């Protein structure tokens, strides 16, 4: 039976943690003591020093030879059961997705055991329960957080491959990742080089691209006063995990306002009307002053020909034609000898290029159905810029249908002066649709195929791996490299993440020291233990203080909507405890050990899963709400479980 003293002990353990959190919240929101930059510094200190040393302190002081394997088996079985159920749901349900699988696994199985669990369970059930929580922390740090990283990197690799190698992924036999590439989370610009071997297989090299960011910087400086800055600002999209640089405009009027400056656009593309004799659809960027290497291929038909020749590489267009199949397209950016790139601005997220092997060269064009771009010209002609467009959004999908409908009924120019060689059709169609989509109300110029028929497809609007015509075949299943190749790539990226994470070292060193010290009864030198304890003692309070700063910096406590927040709280405080109760009973756990397992599963959401979700952009709003709102309701919920289980 729970007495008043028991309740007081629980509150005495938990209230100080909430005091630290409230003080941090007030320091930002009410009193303005800390700026966001200062908060970032505090959070960095907590992540690099306070929490790792706190983890080391708890793990190194726990006896690994007295671990309760039944309790650990029940906890591990809970996670395996939930993960298996989510995997089956993701594999066989139409509504299943890898992103939701990861998020639901985090919500249901990964509580804040280190910061909240140890003091709370010790106050409720005694010191032995605190030792059980330390054992859970060891498994979380070494196994379950590593599994989370594996899932996130698998998602990042899948996105990268599907966008840059949508039809040839099955031919990839190896990946080599440069040492300065830390993650495939999509936050840093990456460049892929694909070498074609004698066996016809692809050998891909992934490296960080400095050219993409430098070109974006050059474009910003050159057009800072002319083009609206929002045109190159990332905006939200339903392509989860991708920051999308695109123009906020569409062909049809939409509820959102357009930030596109049409005057600047036409001024840029109408600077010259004289085409190349070979290609009839060209413009010089910036007019006569653009100098050599300034050809931009657009849909502005010429009024006559000029004696000058184009510096355009026909091999690029031949490659573009091949790469355009299956609904992919090129948006036609050309890079001119380190000068300003043509409009629209390239996306620095991913770039791709290929280098030859055994005298064989082939370019892999990415930007799978959402839209992409090929950049060539001068010394940069080996680089392909992959633009991750938001054409998968509902507005853009509607525009794709409208564009196709109009394409079949639009008057077609048949002037022989502006006819296009067959190998140029895909590129010019792509540029046409780009211009039409960015210029509401403008009547487009629709190209004809060799038979004089409109193809009925918009390469720019094409969906990945499918024909976008009404009545066309459904999407084909995305090819992926062999499992061994994917596994090796993901293990490389996970390893690079782990060796840069201080918590990895603190957990492994703490476990190693505990194995040695409890085996041979060796005590840590006083100087070393004192150096660790002076920071680890502050770790618990600083972790809660950092959480309060995080809460204060968020615009809303409930960032994902009330219905989604309610669903997340149900998964966190009901599903997790229910499943671990079932797995514990199945293993044969009863009494206080069963109660500890259930209360531990009802702790608030862990912070580390939120950090991963934020970094990889997989439902960070849901995890943010689970952390913040979960901390507010965790005390009454866990006390309620404690009281009900003690009846």
Swiss-Prot record:
Tissues expressing the protein: Root-specific. Localized to the cortex, epidermis and lateral root cap, predominantly at the upper side of cells.
Region (Disordered): 339-380, 397-420, 440-481
Induction cue: Down-regulated by endoplasmic reticulum stress treatment.
Record membrane topology: Multi-pass membrane protein
Compositionally skewed regions (Gly residues) per UniProt: 366-378
Recorded consequence of changing residue 258 to A: Reduced phosphorylation and lost ability to recruit NPY1/MAB4 and NPY5/MEL1 to the plasma membrane
Entry keyword set: Auxin signaling pathway, Cell membrane, Membrane, Phosphoprotein, Transmembrane, Transmembrane helix, Transport
Intervals, Extracellular compartment: 1-7, 60-68, 122-131, 529-531, 590-592
Record GO biological process: auxin polar transport; auxin-activated signaling pathway; positive gravitropism; response to auxin; response to ethylene; response to glucose; response to hypoxia
GO cellular component terms listed in the entry, alphabetical order: basal part of cell; basal plasma membrane; lytic vacuole; plasma membrane
KW Methyltransferase (keyword) present: no
Knockout mutant characteristics: Loss-of-function mutations impair the root gravitropic response, lead to an increased sensitivity to ethylene and auxin transport inhibitors, and give rise to an auxin accumulation in root tips. Exclusive NPY5/MEL1 cytosolic subcellular localization and in apolar aggregates close to the plasma membrane in root epidermis and lateral root cap cells.
Assembly and oligomerization: Homodimer. Interacts with FYPP1 and FYPP3. Component of a complex made of PINs (e.g. PIN1 and PIN2), MAB4/MELs (e.g. NPY1/MAB4 and NPY5/MEL1) and AGC kinases (e.g. D6PK and PID) at the plasma membrane. Binds directly to NPY1/MAB4, NPY5/MEL1 and PID.
Similarity-based family: Belongs to the auxin efflux carrier (TC 2.A.69.1) family.
Summary of the function given for this chain in its UniProt record: Acts as a component of the auxin efflux carrier. Seems to be involved in the root-specific auxin transport, and mediates the root gravitropism. Its particular localization suggests a role in the translocation of auxin towards the elongation zone. Recrutes NPY proteins (e.g. NPY1/MAB4 and NPY5/MEL1) to the plasma membrane in a polar basal localization in root epidermis; this activity is optimized by AGC kinases-mediated (e.g. D6PK and PID) phosphorylation that limits their lateral diffusion-based escape.
Record protein name field: Auxin efflux carrier component 2
Gene assigned in the entry: PIN2
């Amino acid at each position: 039976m729970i007495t008043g003293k028991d309740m007081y002990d629980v509150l005495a353990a938990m209230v100080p943690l909430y005091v630290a959190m409230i003080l941090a919240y007030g320091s930002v929101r009410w009193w303005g003591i800390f700026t966001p930059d200062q908060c970032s510094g505090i959070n960095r200190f907590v992540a690099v020093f306070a929490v790792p040393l706190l983890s080391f302190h708890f793990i190194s002081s726990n006896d690994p030879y007295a671990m309760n394997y039944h309790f650990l088996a029940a906890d591990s079985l809970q996670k395996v059961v939930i993960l298996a159920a989510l995997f089956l749901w993701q594999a066989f349900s139409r509504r299943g997705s890898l992103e939701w699988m990861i998020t639901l696994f985090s919500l249901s199985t990964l509580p804040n055991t280190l910061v909240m669990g140890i003091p709370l369970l010790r106050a409720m059930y005694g010191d032995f329960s605190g030792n059980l929580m330390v054992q859970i922390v060891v498994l979380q740090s070494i196994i379950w957080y590593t599994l989370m990283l594996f899932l996130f990197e698998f998602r990042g690799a899948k996105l990268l491959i599907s966008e840059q190698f949508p039809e040839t992924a099955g031919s990839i036999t190896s990946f080599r990742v440069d040492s300065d590439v830390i993650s495939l989370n999509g936050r840093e610009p990456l460049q892929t080089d694909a070498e074609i071997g004698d066996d016809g297989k692809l050998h891909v090299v992934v490296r960080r691209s400095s050219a993409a960011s430098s070109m974006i910087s050059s474009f910003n400086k050159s057009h800072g006063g002319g083009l609206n800055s929002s045109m190159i600002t990332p905006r939200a999209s339903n392509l989860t995990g991708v920051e999308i640089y695109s123009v906020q405009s569409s062909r049809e009027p939409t509820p959102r306002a357009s930030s596109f400056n049409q005057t600047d656009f036409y001024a840029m593309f109408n600077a010259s009307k004289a085409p190349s004799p070979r290609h009839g659809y060209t413009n010089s960027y910036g007019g006569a002053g653009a100098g050599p290497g300034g050809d931009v291929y657009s849909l502005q038909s010429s009024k006559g020909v000029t004696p000058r020749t184009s510096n355009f590489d026909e091999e690029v267009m031949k490659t573009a034609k091949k790469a355009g199949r299956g609904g992919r397209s090129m948006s036609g950016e050309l890079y001119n000898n380190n000068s300003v790139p043509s409009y629209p601005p390239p996306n620095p997220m991913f770039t791709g290029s290929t280098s030859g092997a055994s005298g064989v060269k082939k370019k892999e064009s990415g930007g799978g159905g959402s839209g992409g771009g090929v950049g060539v010209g001068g010394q940069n002609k080996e680089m392909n810029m992959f633009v991750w467009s938001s054409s998968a959004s509902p507005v853009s999908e509607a525009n794709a249908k409208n564009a196709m409908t109009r394409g079949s009924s639009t008057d077609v120019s048949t002037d022989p002066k502006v006819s296009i060689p067959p190998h140029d059709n895909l590129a010019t169609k792509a540029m046409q649709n780009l211009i039409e989509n960015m210029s509401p109300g403008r009547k487009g110029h629709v190209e004809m195929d060799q038979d004089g028929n409109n193809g009925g497809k918009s390469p720019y609007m094409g969906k990945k791996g499918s024909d976008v015509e009404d009545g066309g075949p459904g999407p084909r299943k995305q090819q992926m490299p062999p499992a061994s190749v994917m596994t090796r790539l993901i293990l490389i990226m996970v390893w690079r993440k782990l060796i840069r994470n201080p918590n990895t070292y603190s957990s492994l060193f703490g476990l190693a020291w505990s194995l040695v010290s409890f085996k041979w009864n060796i005590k840590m030198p006083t100087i070393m233990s004192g150096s660790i304890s002076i920071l680890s003692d502050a770790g618990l309070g600083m972790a809660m203080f950092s959480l309060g700063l995080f809460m204060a910096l968020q615009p809303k406590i409930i960032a994902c909507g009330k219905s989604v927040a309610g669903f997340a709280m149900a998964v966190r405080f009901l599903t997790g405890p229910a499943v671990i109760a079932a797995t514990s009973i199945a293993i044969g756990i009863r009494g206080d050990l069963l109660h500890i397992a259930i209360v531990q599963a009802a702790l608030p959401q862990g912070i580390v899963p939120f950090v991963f979700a934020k970094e990889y952009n997989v439902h960070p709003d849901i995890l943010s709400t689970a952390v913040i709102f979960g901390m507010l309701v965790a005390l009454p919920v866990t006390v309620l479980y404690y009281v009900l289980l003690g009846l």
